[in-house]
């Protein structure tokens, strides 16, 4: 028996695991004192074993989980024992990895051994896979005599700290850097937001269109690029996350190939960034041939990163290939935020805004140049007339006439400029400031045209507040009152609710609104149009036979013009008992280049009122956005005194 015991001596391999800067070694060495009656197994086979020395080093990242392959034999033979002096103890750490509490013994002579199977112990996961040793595996293998004789008790590992384990099971999430944004103070930004609000409420399209900024472009694009980067990193790191269980081969060529692959594995370092347990290859029970099922989440196999060998097994042993990936642990190798792309995209956004701003400036310059050319042409005509007068009339008679004519023209121009923008005196300024002070909001400040203006209504003219219906109706009535003066066209202005009622309820709902008014007897009809959050103006000019739509945001609304033309037809039949002659009538919508445009989201009501003011005086529309603060103060004084300046 001593000879048999000497031949049965076996020294198991040593598996080294490098994880979180800690080294755990597993020495699978049986204890001595095996009974003689248990040495004879089925068919009294005495199997010679070959010592397989496997030294695999797996380098794991801080956020990656690691696994420790444990190798043992299902069919131990009588020559797989050591002397009584080589006593080995085994311990199991908290995460399911096996270690040896005693130093490994020196290498012994290698012997051939048949039917040796290698199994992979994996850490217990949430899917129900548990760490099982000594014959109990996930594939329901039977318990061998060797395992019954040499049970291995788990021993808690003091070297495996709880904090390290917690760092593996629940790694700290990477804190994303918050992106700071600059507050937009440019008027074009407010104008763009206001234009988008109008499109949402009215469903109309406006001529000046800019890229929408509901969600910042640089953030959405960076998120999409981060997703692509994450996919690439998972693709690269996933290829190095597989472990294999290699069964022993009875032939010498199979054993040699296993040793060759083991030597290659001993010099390889694998990066396991993230894993989830997933079986990617199964061994046939009879033939041991590897079958590779295709999964939608599996990654392609790279032979440079992982060495694998297809082996055959005898009896009921099976070869299992496991691919382990962790879907819950994020990979730190790829950044979720690329600063360079963000800077480029942010720069492109601001470049587009700058180009839009420059385009608007060019349009305003072109409009100013056009007005200047018109004035120069008028001056040229006046100079031409004066030259002809000099040629016809003697010089001594021409001098006083010319001087009188020039003086009259200069005086007329000064009067026009003073009428268009009269100066607000200090007394007027004090009165206006007094109105804007805090007081009783229901206090009546002005009353006329069967309308009452309170302090609350006047507050809509302060700063950038939106004008309400009472202010606009009161101002339109003042325009009607001024039209009674000599030399001005007669005007009738409809209520601010007229067009909305006409559009929604039809002519029958508004035909009594003109019971005491003959709309065909005036020169101009003013129709304020409210689009929910925006004020516009429609003008019916019976002298020129046209209906024109004015929008300070550049909107086109030919539908409103058609509704008003249809109203004139029905009004003529109802009041005049005859059809309205539409021959020669034209419908227009003023473009943004033809009339002044608002540069914020607050002055649409002021623009509509000032459009009506210029049209009812037969004056060109020559104001701009810069005049709006002046017009607001001026309108306060005009409403308080019920008189236009």
From Swiss-Prot:
Pfam families: Peptidase_C48 (PF02902). It comes from the Eukaryota. The gene is SENP1. GO terms for biological process: protein desumoylation; proteolysis. GO terms for molecular function: deSUMOylase activity; SUMO-specific endopeptidase activity. Keywords: Cytoplasm, Hydrolase, Nucleus, Phosphoprotein, Protease, Thiol protease, Ubl conjugation pathway. This is Sentrin-specific protease 1. PANTHER family: SENTRIN-SPECIFIC PROTEASE 1 (PTHR12606:SF30), SENTRIN/SUMO-SPECIFIC PROTEASE (PTHR12606). The modification Phosphoserine is found at residues 57, 117, 157. A motif (Nuclear export signal) lies at residues 636-645. Residues 92-117, 285-313 are annotated as: Disordered. It is found in: Nucleus; Cytoplasm. Residues 451-614, 451-615 are annotated as: Protease. Its EC number is 3.4.22.-. Protease that catalyzes two essential functions in the SUMO pathway. The first is the hydrolysis of an alpha-linked peptide bond at the C-terminal end of the small ubiquitin-like modifier (SUMO) propeptides, SUMO1, SUMO2 and SUMO3 leading to the mature form of the proteins. The second is the deconjugation of SUMO1, SUMO2 and SUMO3 from targeted proteins, by cleaving an epsilon-linked peptide bond between the C-terminal glycine of the mature SUMO and the lysine epsilon-amino group of the target protein. Deconjugates SUMO1 from HIPK2. Signal peptide: none annotated. Interacts with RBM33; promoting ALKBH5 desumoylation and subsequent activation. It comes from Pongo abelii (Sumatran orangutan). GO terms for cellular component: cytoplasm; nucleus.
């Amino acid at each position: 028996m001593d000879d048999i015991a000497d031949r049965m001596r076996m020294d198991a391999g040593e598996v080294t695991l490098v994880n979180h800067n800690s080294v755990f070694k597993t020495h699978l060495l049986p204890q001595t004192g095996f009974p003689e009656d248990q040495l004879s197994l089925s068919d009294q086979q005495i199997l010679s074993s070959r010592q397989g020395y496997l030294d695999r080093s797996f380098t794991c990242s801080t956020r990656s989980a690691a696994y420790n392959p444990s190798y043992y034999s299902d069919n131990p033979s009588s020559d797989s024992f050591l002397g009584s002096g080589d006593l080995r103890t085994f311990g199991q750490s908290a995460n399911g990895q096996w270690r040896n509490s005693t130093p490994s013994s020196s290498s012994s002579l290698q012997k051939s051994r048949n039917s040796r199977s290698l199994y992979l112990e994996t850490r217990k996961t949430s899917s129900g896979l548990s760490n099982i040793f000594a014959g109990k595996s996930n594939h329901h293998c039977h318990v061998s005599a060797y395992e019954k004789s040499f049970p291995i008790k788990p021993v808690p590992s003091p070297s495996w700290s709880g904090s390290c384990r917690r760092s593996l099971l629940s790694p700290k999430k990477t804190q994303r850097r918050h992106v700071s944004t600059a507050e937009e103070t440019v008027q074009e930004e407010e104008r763009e937001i206001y234009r988008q609000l109008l499109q949402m409420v009215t469903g109309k399209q406006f001529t000046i269109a800019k890229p929408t900024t509901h969600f910042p472009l640089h953030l959405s694009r960076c998120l999409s690029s981060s997703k692509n980067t994450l996919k690439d990193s998972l693709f690269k790191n996933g290829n190095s996350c597989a472990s294999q269980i290699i069964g022993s081969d009875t032939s010498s060529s199979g054993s040699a190939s296993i040793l060759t692959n083991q030597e290659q594995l001993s010099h390889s370092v694998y990066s396991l960034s993230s894993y989830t347990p997933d079986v990617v290859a199964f061994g046939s029970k009879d033939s041991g041939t590897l079958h590779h099922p295709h999964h939608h989440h599996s990654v392609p196999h790279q032979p440079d990163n992982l060495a694998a060998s297809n082996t055959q097994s005898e009896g009921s042993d099976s070869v299992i290939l496991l691919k382990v990936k962790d879907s819950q642990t994020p990979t730190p190798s790829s950044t979720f935020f690329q600063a360079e792309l963000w800077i480029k995209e942010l720069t492109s956004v601001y470049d587009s805004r700058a180009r839009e701003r420059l385009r608007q400036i060019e349009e305003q310059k072109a409009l100013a140049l056009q007005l200047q050319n018109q004035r120069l042409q008028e001056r040229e005509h006046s100079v031409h007339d004066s030259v002809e007068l000099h040629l016809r009339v003697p010089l001594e008679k021409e001098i006083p006439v010319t001087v009188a004519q020039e003086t009259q023209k200069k005086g007329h121009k000064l009067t026009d400029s003073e009428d268009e923008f009269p100066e607000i005196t200090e007394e007027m300024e004090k009165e206006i400031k007094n109105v804007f002070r805090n007081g009783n909001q229901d206090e009546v400040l002005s009353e006329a045209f069967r309308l009452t203006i309170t302090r609350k209504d006047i507050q809509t003219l302060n700063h950038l507040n939106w004008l309400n219906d009472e202010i606009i109706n009161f101002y339109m009535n003042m325009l009607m009152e001024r039209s009674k003066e000599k030399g001005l066209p007669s005007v009738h202005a409809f209520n601010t609710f007229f067009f909305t009622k006409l559009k929604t309820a039809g002519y029958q709902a508004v035909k009594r609104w003109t019971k005491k008014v003959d709309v065909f007897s005036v020169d101009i009809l003013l129709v304020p149009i409210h689009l929910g959050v925006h004020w516009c103006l429609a003008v019916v000019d019976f002298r020129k036979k046209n209906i024109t739509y004015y929008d300070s945001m550049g909107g086109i609304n030919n539908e409103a013009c058609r509704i008003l033309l249809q109203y004139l037809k029905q009004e003529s039949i109802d009041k005049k008992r005859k059809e309205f002659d539409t021959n020669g009538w034209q419908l227009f919508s003023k473009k943004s280049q033809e009339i002044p445009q608002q540069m914020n989201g607050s002055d649409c009501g002021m623009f509509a009122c000032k459009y009506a003011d210029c049209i009812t005086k037969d004056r060109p529309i020559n104001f701009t956005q810069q005049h709006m603060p002046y017009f607001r103060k001026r309108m306060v004084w005009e409403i308080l005194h019920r008189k236009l300046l």
